[in-house]
Amino acid sequence: FFLARVKFEHALRNTTLTPSSSRGVLYKRAHFSLTMMNVMKCLKSYVLAHEYTEETILRYFFSLAFLSFLTHELLHLMSALIFPKYLFGEKKWEKLAKHRRAQVVHAPNQILNGLLAGQVVRGSLERFPSAMKKNGKFDVGRRLETTTRGGGLFGGFLNLLTKGGVLGGKAVTFRRTTVLATAASCGYLMYDFLLLTIFDRKNMLRAHGRRQYMIYIMHHVLPLLMWPVATRYGTFEYFVAWGVRSELSQAAMGLRTVCIGMGILDTIYGVIVQLNFVGVYFWVRMWPLLDHVRSMAKADWFAENVPRWQLPFAFFTVPVPAMLNVYWWFMIMGAVWKVVSGGNKKKKEA
């Protein structure tokens, strides 16, 4: 699959788009999309038929993640076909800079990831100190529970999709909602990581700038390495679930990116989208911050149900998302202040 994707992108970049070559590109895209859909169908059959246990949770997790990855690849291809012709128009699309086009085509993936992962994980969220032990310590390790997991708007869908996660009548891994949302988010992160580093590196680097580009690389690598480990051993679910929840702001960011590409960010609709992005970011990333800090301070890091070899990684990876959220919040507030104070207008006049 990976080699087919590379060959397709290489052929697309090195083809002069005449009417005949355009048909060839469309044919290749259709063939590639059909291949992905067949793989997704096989994975879906496996996921629906599989009842995961503690020993098989990783295989189940990666199957879901790969299904999510293929979904995002397919959505990216569809966006590249639909946006230039139907949403923007070919003339308007040609006027956009290449890095701006790349961002706009990527926006639907951000929206899908934010809505899917950010909403599905809602059933797993809890506020500190609801998971504290009697000794006043926050339990970050595995908890055995007999309660039914899932529920809410996605309950029926999750029960159909996950079918299990129990061993001897007790849950021994993450909540079903956490497993599904985390796997879906990891599939998106893998798609975006390959886009950043291989498939569209030049445009992504220009769009984000070198510093933000490197931050995004680190932001993607850490969850891809640590979330599967945490899922396998049932540890640090509180922090993982809230990390996935923060992806909800990606949906608002993707909508904002589309507005920028269409040139309507300064209209009343653009203002609503901007305010929505700031509000959602604060809601899912900044509002829970105090709970996160208290949880890290009160966490029982050396509990018996936490493998010792995980501790060095946890001490580094758990605080990083909170620090990045604060850093990005100050960047957002700086941009808001420029708009309010008229800094952008003065710069244009100069």
Predicted feature locations:
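Low-complexity, disordered terminal segments
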Residues: F1-L3, S20
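Membrane-helix and juxtamembrane interface regions of eukaryotic multi-pass membrane proteins
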Residues: S33-R245, T257-A350
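Nucleic-acid-interacting cores, centered on viral/eukaryotic replication and modification enzymes
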Residues: M253
